[in-house]
Amino acid sequence: MAESEQTQVIQPKKKMGFGKKLIIILAVIVAFLGVCSLMIVHQNNQLEKKFYQVKSNKVVDNIRIVALADLHLKEFGKDNEKLVAEVKNLSPDIVAIVGDMNLESQPDNYSSVISLCKQLNEIAPVYYCLGNHEIDAMLFKNSNIYKDIKAEDIKIFNNETETVNIGGTAIDIIGLTQNPTEFDEYGKDFFEKAMSADDNFKLLLTHYPEYFLGKLNDYDIDLAITGHAHGGQVRLPFIGGLYAADQGLFPKLCDGYHEDGNSKFIVSRGLGKSGIVPRINNKPEIVIADISWY
């Protein structure tokens, strides 16, 4: 008797419904955004040190300047202990602050800035040049940040200059706080007088790199340190910064060391942010400028 043939019935696979596909796609997107957010948060709390070597025949021995900019009330550790420790380990001769350590939107909230300045001043003399957030808080919201920092024996500049001697080298520290658009009317006389006073090494502290888009390039500035541009906020591979205040898209001057005309200047990427757009691929930066004759 022949064996009976058996027929195998193959059931068609059920197609995944649109709803399930959508849920999976959304879950992947949420997971991706979550990972990206964690990476951004991690990056924005990692301090990066950027070293620059500047040569000058006006100095006797090596001078180290540590520069900070654009903290905008961000704290690295309790009472900025991580930031202070990093600066201390760098053994600076002076600490230069080039503005926007506060937030103009919180005109009376700057106790952390004063605390940081006091801690840094125990490491090395602090020289603080006002930025637009300090100026705007003072002019339009009656902030006492300038007076209160000055009361703590911190040298804070508002279109002022001071000569210091470091290891036998005389340095004229010039704090230019005027916005570049108002320079000709309110800042030029002060600046030119400070520049022509003597043949000392000229260290310019100003918040605005835009000064070097035409206004100050022909002056013999031995070194200027600026901030304001936040490194372009979002840094694109092979391109650089995406956007900076007062420069717009793809800013020319948002980070790094530059020589243009007779001037040498550094643009700090800064430490914090002032708006809702996060810093992306743009770690907070401590600038170290080593000035030497060799």
Language-model features: locations:
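Mobile, glycine- and charge-enriched loop segments
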Residues: 47-77, 186-209
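Short, Asp-centered acidic motifs that coordinate Mg2+ and/or phosphate
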Residues: 93-94, 127, 154-155, 171, ...
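Membrane-embedded segments
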Residues: 62-157
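Active-site metal-binding loops of divalent metal-dependent hydrolases
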Residues: 68-73, 99-101, 132-134, 160-161, ...
